[in-house]
Structure formats: structure tokens, C-alpha cells
Amino acid sequence: MNRAGNIEKAFELAREEYQAIGVDVDSALQRMRDVEISVHCWQGDDVKGFEGDDGALGNGLAVTGNYPGRARTIDELQSDLELAYSLIPGNHRLNLHALYGEFKGRVDRDEIEVEHFQGWIDWARDQKVRLDFNPSYFSHPNAADGFTLAHADSGIRQFWIDHGIACRKIAAAMGAAQSNPCINNFWVPDGYKDVPADRKAPRERLADSLDSIFATEYPAEQTLDAVECKLFGIGSESYVVGSHEFYMGYAMSRYKVLCLDAGHFHPTETISDKISAVMMYVPELLLHVSRGVRWDSDHVVTYSDELQSIMQEVVRGDYLGRVHIGLDFFDASINRVAAWAIGTRNALKAVLAALLEPTEQLRKMELEGDLTGRLALLEEQKTLPLGAVWNHYCQSVDVPAGSDWLENVRQYESQVLSQRSDSSALV
């Protein structure tokens, strides 16, 4: 029997095992087809963008490694993304930052317009990919001292307010073009390296700046505003203006989407435990699935306990319709297309695993006080044949099963990536 036949045979056996514990595999696979992951563009070029100034990455962001093949142009980045999407089962999104526009000449960030992203809109339509967006509040002279929307200088603050206003207009145009809301996520690096004398004033300025940016209302069918918190960053170890409490309150009071990044909290703190709590009070949630190693290092997402817990909480709470799943990692030490494939496939595997969990049976045991049975079933289901179901899912949508996708990447690396030369990939 050939490999395809073996995959189907293994799937039939796996389906029987899951049925034995009350799990409808076919229903889970049907739900999987509606799951969209927002794949981040910045993994492909080490967060450099296309503004043309080749400025250093700043404001607490760092990319390490010098693996050859970094995308240097929009065409190269789009080519890399097309390969990555072909290796990932399902229809997914692209998350763009504002510094990735098609700029002909110097265009400052408060001057960007829809026309600078029309090429991306056209490409996304052709690729059947939906777009999400982000203002870029970093790696710019007006962010050199670590402050943007909370800056004490009203002129600098207004520059960044205008950038946010421009980005919302672009996001709305993207959403209108794709007939689906473009999630527009706001993260700013503002904070102090050492203990501040005034924690209140910067937060008041940030709230006022955000209110100014959001003053114009756009239809929810076009764009949704998200706000993202962080505990600390390089250069803002002692104080971050946009803390979790700040943005939680802001999202609740202004009816905005809250963004939780898996790497933006203390290393012993997990966002999986926060999901059911915040979903009681905010309309929708944006997840930045990442992997921090001792700090917000943005390692490639692996199939970790926390990744599984995040997706379990999303599925158990029946939040798939209100939670937007995005990725946020950047690693220049390995093949960048492979990084996309590994991280996105792992995120999807975790969603599938959560959909294959005997959740109702576990809840029944818990309500009846059968905590022994709950633990036993939770542990037993960990070794059920998820891989067989995953391989079937990949094969059913003409995507390489198992590690077969790696050969596609190797070939692309040999034929395409190896022809690129860029010594600046080491940051």
C-alpha cells in the first residue's frame, strides 16, 4: 500500500479510537476548515520592512541569526509566503505591518495611504488570503527615546496619532476589499528603563492619543481595532505605559478587541488562563501566539503544553467565533519559510487536538465530582492518534502530510533562496 493509502488506513483506525470516547472526528475536521491563522509577514525579512532606510531594528525588538535567503523585496516576500501557504492546510490570513508598504521614494509614517498597500490588496485577492494590519510604532527617529503615543512632546505625539489614523484608513480599505474585517492591532513600546517619577501622566497621554486615533468610526465589517499590552521590554524594564491593566480597561470601556501576546507576560504567567476571564468582558480577543524562552524572545511556536492549553481554552469556551488567532515570532537562525510552516502547522495541530478532546465527558465528570476520572481521561487522550487525523486532514486538502513539506522547502532553498545575498540579515 502506498503512503496515501497508509494515511487513510491509519485515519480510519484513529477515527474508531476517538469514537470510542465519544468524539466525532468528522465534525472536528469540518470545524477545522473554518479556522484561520493570521500569518505574520515579518518572519520573512527579519522585521526590516520596505521603507528603504535600512535602519536598525529598535524599541526592544531583536532578531538573531544570519540564515541566508531573507526576503529583500515585496516580490520575494510574496513568493516566500506563497510557498508557506501551500504547506499549511486551510485558508489563512496575512498580518502586515505598516512599514511593509510599496513606497516609491521617501514616505514618512504619518503620510502612508491606501495606495501604498494596493499591491498587497491585489495580491491577497489573487491568493485568496485575507489581510490584517498593524501600525508600526518602532524603528523610527520619532521613537528613538522609547516613547510614541505617550510622548511628552505634543508634536511627536501628534505624528504618531496621525500614523494611527492613516493605518485605520488603510485597514478599513483592506477589509472592504476582502469583504471581511481587517484586524488592526495597536502596540506601542512606550516605557522607561528605570523607575519613573510619574506613572500616571504617560498613561493619560496614551489614552488621549488612542481616543484621538479612534475618533472616526469605521464599520465593523471593514476593520476592528485591537490593543496589545506588554509587561516589559528591552529598554522598558521598569515601566510600560500600555500594561495589561491599562489595555484591559481601555478595551472594556471603548469596546475594542484585546490582544494577548503569549510572550508579553512574566515567564511563569500564561495567557491560556486569561482567555475565559477576559472573554467575559471584551467583545473579541486577538491572540499573538508566540514562544518566549526566559523572556519575550519570539521563538518559533512549538507544540508545547502552553500552545495546547491556549487552543483548549479557545475551543472549550466555544470562542472560535470571537477569537482571532495570529502568530508573532521571528527567527533568522533557520530557514524562514520553514519557520512559518512549523509554527503555523503547530498552531493548527493544537486547534485540532482541542477539537478532538472529549470535552463534554470531561465536564460531566468534573460536575459530578469525579476528579479521578477527569484526570485519567485527560491523560489517556494525550496519546490518542492525533497524528493520523492530522495527516488525513493535510492530505484531504492537498497539503504535504507529516514532514513531507520539508522537501518542498529544501528545493525552494536550493533554487531560489540560495540566490539571494544579504549580509545585513545578522541583527
Curated annotation (Swiss-Prot):
One of its GO terms (biological process) is rhamnose catabolic process. SUPFAM superfamilies: Xylose isomerase-like. Its cofactor is Mn(2+). Binds 1 Mn(2+) ion per subunit. Its main location: cytoplasm. Mn(2+) binds at H264, D296, D298. GO terms for molecular function: L-rhamnose isomerase activity; manganese ion binding. It catalyses: L-rhamnopyranose = L-rhamnulose. Belongs to the rhamnose isomerase family. Catalyzes the interconversion of L-rhamnose and L-rhamnulose. This is L-rhamnose isomerase. It comes from Rhodopirellula baltica (strain DSM 10527 / NCIMB 13988 / SH1). The lineage of its organism: Bacteria, Pseudomonadati, Planctomycetota, Planctomycetia, Pirellulales.
